[in-house]
A protein has these predicted regions:
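Positively charged n-region of N-terminal signal peptides that target proteins for export
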Residues: 1-7
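Solvent-exposed, well-ordered amphipathic alpha-helical segments
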Residues: 18-19, 214
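Bacterial N-terminal signal peptides
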Residues: 7-18
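N-terminal secretory/targeting leader peptides
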Residues: 24-118, 126-129, 133-337
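Short, low-complexity interaction segments enriched in Ser/Thr/Pro/Gly
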Residues: 4, 20-22
C-alpha cells in the first residue's frame, strides 16, 4: 500500500514538536500568490487552505491569498518565492523549469494519463514525493500536487483533424515539452502569461489555446474563441510550494498543523476539480458563443499518433529515467499507437 506524500510529511513532523517560543510574533503571516481567479479549483483550494490554517493553528497563522496575478505575474512569482517576498505559491508544474529542474515537464507529455486515477498513482505515490523533494536544492519546499484537469484546444475555426491545426498560433505555458507538442500538430507555440491570454486572443495576436474547461470559463475565453475541441490531450496541475527557509524556521507544531491543512486542501482541490470542469463546460455551452466538438475515435487516434512523437523527442530533456518511471507506474506503453 502506498503512503501518500501528506501522510509522510505528517509522520516526519510528529517527531519534532516543540512549544511555541514565548516571543514568537503572532499571527504568522503567509502570503500565498497565484495567477487564476478565486472561483477556479486552485483559487477555491487556496482559500480553503487559508481557512483551515487559521482554524487548525487557532489563529496563530494568517494566510493572505492573492489571486489573479494581483501580487506577482507568472514569470515573477517563483523568483519572489526564492527571495522570500512571498511565502507560498501553487504554480503549474511546467513553471518549475524556471528552477532548472526539467523533470516536472513529464506531466506535459501528451496522452500520458488515461484518467485522473492513473495520474494520482504518480502524484500521490513515491514518485511524486521524489519529484517534490528535488526542489529543496533550489530553496523551495514541495508540499503537494493539486489537480486542475485535462486540457482541450480552442480556436476560431473548427479543429476536427490534423490539417486544421496547421499554422495556428497556440498559447502555451513556457515549456519545451509543450512547444514540441504543438509543433507535432503543424502549429506554432506561443508562450504567454496566463493573465494576458484573453487579450492576446481578442486582438488576434494568437489564434488558439489549450486549457481545462474551468480556465476557459473563468477567464471568459469563450467570448473570443468560437470553437473548443474536447481532446483531453494533456494534464494541467499545480505544485503547492513554500520558501524552504521560511518553512523550516516555523515552529514544529505550526509546520504539523499547516501540513494537515495542506492535506485537507489537497483532498478538497482534487475532489472539486473534475466537478468544476464539468460544470464549466456546461456553462460554456449555455452561452451559445462557442461550439463544442467531440472527436470521433478515428480523429482522436490521428491526433494522438501525431502528438505521441513528443515523447521520444523530449524524454532526454526531461530525463529518461523519470519518463521510464512514470511509464512503469502508469502502465503507459509509448509504442502502443
Amino acid at each position: 500500500m502506498k503512503t501518500t506524500l501528506i501522510k509522510l510529511l505528517l509522520l516526519v513532523l510528529l517527531h519534532g514538536f516543540a512549544p511555541m517560543p514565548a516571543n514568537a510574533k503572532l499571527p504568522i503571516v503567509i502570503k500565498f500568490s497565484h495567477v487564476v481567479t478565486p472561483d477556479t479549483p486552485k483559487g477555491k483550494a487556496a482559500n480553503y487552505f487559508a481557512q483551515r490554517a487559521a482554524e487548525l493553528t487557532e489563529g496563530a497563522v494568517s494566510v493572505e491569498v492573492f489571486p489573479n496575478s494581483t501580487l506577482y505575474k507568472d514569470k515573477d512569482e517563483i523568483q519572489a518565492l526564492q527571495l522570500g517576498a512571498v511565502q507560498m505559491l501553487a504554480p503549474s508544474l511546467a513553471k518549475l523549469t524556471q528552477l532548472g529542474i526539467h523533470e516536472f515537464e513529464v506531466f506535459d507529455l501528451p496522452y500520458l494519463f488515461d484518467d485522473i486515477q492513473t495520474l494520482h498513482r504518480v502524484t500521490e505515490g513515491w514518485l511524486g514525493a521524489n519529484l517534490l523533494g528535488r526542489l529543496e536544492t533550489k530553496g523551495v519546499k514541495g508540499l503537494a500536487f493539486w489537480d486542475n484537469g485535462f486540457k482541450s484546444f480552442s480556436a476560431n475555426r473548427p479543429l476536427h483533424d490534423l490539417p486544421s491545426f496547421k499554422g495556428l498560433r497556440i498559447r502555451i505555458q513556457p515549456s519545451k515539452v509543450l512547444e514540441a507538442q504543438i509543433r507535432t500538430l503543424g502549429a506554432q507555440p506561443s508562450a504567454l502569461p496566463f493573465s494576458g491570454t484573453y487579450q492576446a486572443l481578442r486582438t488576434g495576436f494568437i489564434d488558439g489555446a489549450e486549457n481545462p474547461h474551468s480556465n476557459f470559463f473563468t477567464q471568459k475565453i469563450y467570448e473570443v474563441q468560437k470553437h473548443i475541441v474536447l481532446t483531453n490531450h494533456g494534464y494541467l496541475g499545480y505544485a503547492v510550494i513554500a520558501n524552504k527557509r521560511f518553512w523550516d524556521n516555523l515552529p514544529a507544531r505550526i509546520r504539523y498543523q499547516l501540513t494537515q491543512a495542506i492535506g485537507e486542501a489537497t483532498e478538497y482541490a482534487n475532489r472539486i476539480a473534475q466537478e468544476e470542469n464539468d460544470q464549466a463546460l456546461q456553462k460554456i455551452k449555455a452561452t451559445g458563443k462557442t461550439r463544442i466538438y467531440t472527436l470521433s475515435a478515428a480523429e482522436r487516434a490521428e491526433l494522438r499518433r501525431a502528438m505521441l512523437a513528443t515523447h521520444a523527442k523530449m524524454a532526454p530533456y526531461i530525463g529518461q529515467s523519470v519518463v521510464n518511471a512514470v511509464y512503469e507506474e502508469t502502465g503507459f506503453d509509448p509504442n502502443k499507437q
